[in-house]
Regions:
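Accessory RNA 3′-end/elbow-binding domains used by RNA modification enzymes
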Residues: 1-62, 130-135, 152, 175, ...
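Short, intrinsically disordered, mixed-charge
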Residues: 52-57, 90, 115-120, 170-178
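Glycine/acidic-rich beta-strand-loop module
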Residues: 55, 59-88
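Short, glycine/charge-rich beta-strand/loop segments that flank catalytic centers
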Residues: 64-73, 92-94, 126-133
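Residue-level signal for inorganic ion chemistry
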Residues: 76, 97, 168, 248, ...
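Short, structured patches in soluble enzyme cores that scaffold and shape functional sites
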Residues: 80, 99-103, 144-147, 157-161, ...
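Acidic, low-complexity central loop/insert segments
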Residues: 81-129, 149
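The conserved catalytic core of RNA pseudouridine synthases
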Residues: 131-162, 166-176
């Protein structure tokens, strides 16, 4: 992680807010996200509903739907965090795909076509998709060929959110003139969530909830449910003064004098996360200056706040 640029120095009042990892357990669950390893079989919405019943919460929601036959990383938000999870919809994704060619061809042709289908591509969503079927541009960041076994081609693909891998395989088959289809698919990354130690199964969550409710052991559930802040770790950040927090929670944009620290290399118009000194997520917005401009500014709005995630009055009102 790049070292933050210091614009100003400030202190935080320990009487307000808290470190995201130290929230009381009820608040931790209600503001939490789960990096779930979705199994093959249920729909993403069925998994949401199952988690809602298990945890006895009001609301659950996922970021980036996986089809029933697809497994892997499915981030799920709980209660207030369902709004944070929506920030993942456009985030980069990674998949491991098994594509089945309808005829056997040379490895050279396979490598060439994967190279051809890297960069900007055109896609029309499949007939069964939940979105309007319009031609759209998607970016394929890179494709790694992992293995070829006869007509089966295993590859890893990093792509823009909203890319349809099933359609990607179909279009490759069309371009080759032999036909192809997606045989198996697993998502290995969604924004900041990967197949690391935070990835948990439905059984892990069931066991953790048992330990919490029957043995008063919080540790397993805290390992399964992450603070909402985990869902936006892929975004660059701006740290603000305590005095700026409540005004943002009431709809104000972020002014220059409220900023303490910021990530380097922030671009004009980039979506950033806005955090307290303690590391709590206040909201997210679009910058009106780059890092250098923000650092040198003495006045004016620096971030147009688009989403607020923190409850008002978590920090004291210091604005008029």
């Amino acid at each position: 992680m790049a070292e933050l640029l210091i614009k100003s120095v400030g202190e935080t009042d320990p009487n307000y807010g808290c470190n995201p990892n130290e929230r009381p357990i009820k608040e931790h669950i209600s503001n939490g996200v789960v990096n779930l390893d979705k199994p093959i079989g249920p729909t993403s919405h069925e998994v949401d509903a199952w988690m809602k019943r298990l945890l006895h919460v009001e609301k659950t929601g996922h970021g980036g739907t996986l089809d029933p036959k697809v497994s892997g990383v499915l981030p799920i938000g709980i209660n207030r965090s369902t709004r944070v999870i929506q920030m993942l919809l456009g985030a980069p994704k990674e998949y491991v795909c098994l594509m089945r060619l309808h005829e056997k061809i040379s490895e050279t042709r396979i490598r060439d076509i994967l190279q051809e289908f890297t960069g900007k591509i055109f896609q029309t969503p499949p007939i069964k998709s939940a979105v309007k079927r319009e031609l759209r541009v998607r970016t394929i960041y890179n494709v790694d060929l992992l293995e070829i076994d006869g007509q089966d081609v295993l590859f890893r693909i990093n792509c823009e959110g909203g890319t349809y891998i099933r359609k990607y395989c179909h279009d490759i088959g069309e371009a080759l003139g032999i036909g192809a289809h997606m045989a198996e698919l697993r998502r290995t990354k969604s924004g900041p969530f990967t197949e690391d130690e935070t990835l948990k199964t439905l059984q892990d969550l069931t066991d953790a909830y048992y330990y919490l409710t029957q043995e008063n052991n919080e540790k397993p559930i805290r390992e399964c449910i992450l603070p909402m802040e985990a869902a936006v770790k892929h975004l660059k950040k701006i740290v603000v003064r305590d005095s700026a927090v409540d005004s943002i929670c009431h709809g104000a944009d972020l002014a220059s004098n409220g900023i303490l620290e910021l990530s380097p290399d922030i671009k004009l118009g980039e979506t950033v996360r806005v955090l307290t000194i303690k590391g709590e997520l206040v909201g997210a917005g679009e910058t009106v200056e780059n890092s250098d401009g923000i650092l040198k500014s003495n006045k004016g709005i620096m971030v147009n706040i688009k989403k607020v995630f923190m409850e008002p009055e978590t920090y004291p009102k210091m604005w008029k």
